[in-house]
Amino acid sequence: MDFKRVKEYFAWLYYQYQIITCCAVMEPWEQSMLNTIILTIVAMVVYTAYVFIPIHIRLAWEFFSKICGYDSSISN
């Protein structure tokens, strides 16, 4: 895939984003506010997943290992 196709693909994705969020009909300050809100929400979701998913995986591993009889737990 050459650079031109990648650039066109990202342009298409950005166009789809504008259509889905109705950014095409907003004023520039409204677009920046909406983009800021969306970026903030995405950043919070990524941070929360980064912090809490490993903890939940470890707890689930310990829970199911006790149920299945595998008594060795992950040491901290």
Curated annotation (Swiss-Prot):
Record-annotated membrane-spanning stretches: 12-29, 37-57
Biological process (GO), any one: ceramide biosynthetic process
Induction of synthesis: While expression is androgen independent in the hpg mouse prostate, it appears to be androgen-dependent in the kidney and brain of normal intact mouse suggesting tissue specific regulation by androgens.
Membrane topology (Lumenal): 30-36
GO molecular function: serine C-palmitoyltransferase activity
Tissues in which the UniProt entry reports expression: Expression is strong in hypogonadal (hpg) mouse prostate, weak in mature castrated mouse prostate and absent in normal intact or androgen-replaced hpg mouse prostates.
Membrane topology: Multi-pass membrane protein
Subcellular location(s) of the protein: Endoplasmic reticulum membrane
A cellular component term, taken from the record's GO annotations: serine palmitoyltransferase complex
Record annotation: effect of changing H56L: Mutant mice develop early onset ataxia, exhibit reduced body weight and usually die around 10 weeks after birth. Increases SPT affininity toward C18-CoA substrate by twofold and elevates C20 long chain base production in the brain and eye
Pathway per the UniProt entry: Lipid metabolism; sphingolipid metabolism
Keyword Membrane: yes
Family recorded in the similarity comment: Belongs to the SPTSS family. SPTSSB subfamily.
Oligomeric form and interacting partners: Component of the serine palmitoyltransferase (SPT) complex, which is composed of SPTLC1, SPTLC2 or SPTLC3 and SPTSSA or SPTSSB. The heterodimer consisting of SPTLC1 and SPTLC2/SPTLC3 forms the catalytic core of the enzyme, while SPTSSA or SPTSSB subunits determine substrate specificity. SPT also interacts with ORMDL proteins, especially ORMDL3, which negatively regulate SPT activity in the presence of ceramides.
Protein name as catalogued: Serine palmitoyltransferase small subunit B
Organism: Mus musculus
